[in-house]
Amino acid sequence: MSPTPPHADLPDIAPAVQRDVARLAASPEVRSAFNWLRTHEPQLTQWQMEMARIAAPPFGESARGAWLAERFRQVGLDDVRIDDVGNVFGSHPGFMGYGVGQRYVALSAHIDTVFPASTPLNIRQQGSRLYGPGVSDNGAGVTAMLGIAALLRSVRLRHALPLVFIGNVGEEGEGDLRGMRHIFSTPRWKDSIAYSVVLDGAGSDTVVAEALGSRRFEVIVRGPGGHSWSDFGAPNPVVILAKAIDTFTAAPVPTGPKTTFNIGVIRGGTSVNSIPESASMKVDIRSTSMAEMERLEQTLRLALNRAVEDETMAAEMRSSLQKRPSGVHCEVIPIGNRPAGELAAGARILHAIRAVDAQLNNAAQVQRASTDANIPLSLGQEAIAIGGGGSGGGAHTLQEWFDSNGRELGLKRILLTLLALAGAGDSGAGGSGE
């Protein structure tokens, strides 16, 4: 998650939501829950270290998923199960029960990491800090989710809507949000999750309410190849990519909605005196607008078509007598598609988290980023992504770290937000808040 600058022109927090949050924070039950958080930090750290020592590369999360399912059972969640793609579920009832057609508040955290299975997982603790791959992203998020689940089963808090806890797979890299895609495409969940709170990484200073979309492609150009002397004139895939890149990168992009592109990888050829048989590149397109991403994708495809035509014609002019076949083939392979979306400024979930931050005197910015929340936001559903508290750094490196100082604030923030959305002590849960 790499946030960009905050939303502007947010409306005032709905007074009714602010009153609800203040009432919740002052209740004896919630004060008891806050005390539970203070006394259980050693358990949270133990869980975080245990989990971080279990490899969970993209498409290889099963061992960590099994560990999380066992922890869900251990803390007492209901209906613990693992779905077809590896997502882990556990439920906690509201006083309205689990009836047919019931709406849920979802708390999720991705269990995968960017690191391959062969990565040494040398997790160590030094004071309040943990060090090692994945301890923050997303060790902090999963630990926070597990801590909230354990708290709710230990300190009974009355709320209307049931909660579903989800450890989802496939957030990082080539996972391409596959876990959340699966959840929001299944009949069981796509229409029954009223609000989604996604926990991603450490911190308590951001609220992601806008989904940064991205489309990624691998482009492969193939030609006849040959010797640089005897086969001079044959179309050159590297030249085709160079021409396409020159045309594509000259395309204008808007500053609002912000839209970007990048050529991140380019490969081709075997030696200086060989005409390559193939060349490839990887392209990243990002925007907060689906329409802008589609426009840039079309621009890329047109640039490639033009480059193929130009190089084919140039090859014919260079050597009208060439004996080698001159056919050129260009393939554009999608390797990532994260949809864009935006939470309405008046959405109840945004009022709730902002009211909680005001209650806790916590300064947080509303931002955009690419997270698991992209999926529900792109479907027009209410979702945010926030951190699991504490602080962290070195994400996606072997030097990653997490500091538990400040975790308690993050957990209070998560708990109050869930209770506000689930209608704690309020039979009118699930309304608009106004």
Q: Where is each model-derived feature located?
A:
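Short glycine/proline-enriched loop/turn "hinge" motifs that connect secondary-structure elements
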Residues: 115, 157, 208-214, 272-277, ...
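Acidic/histidine-rich catalytic neighborhood of metal-dependent amide-processing enzymes
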Residues: 129, 134, 138-212, 254, ...
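Acidic/His- and Gly-rich active-site-bordering loop/insert found
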Residues: 2-131
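Metal-dependent amide/peptide-bond hydrolase catalytic core
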Residues: 1-32, 49, 53, 237-434
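Short beta-strand segments
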Residues: 107-109, 166-168, 196-200, 220-222, ...
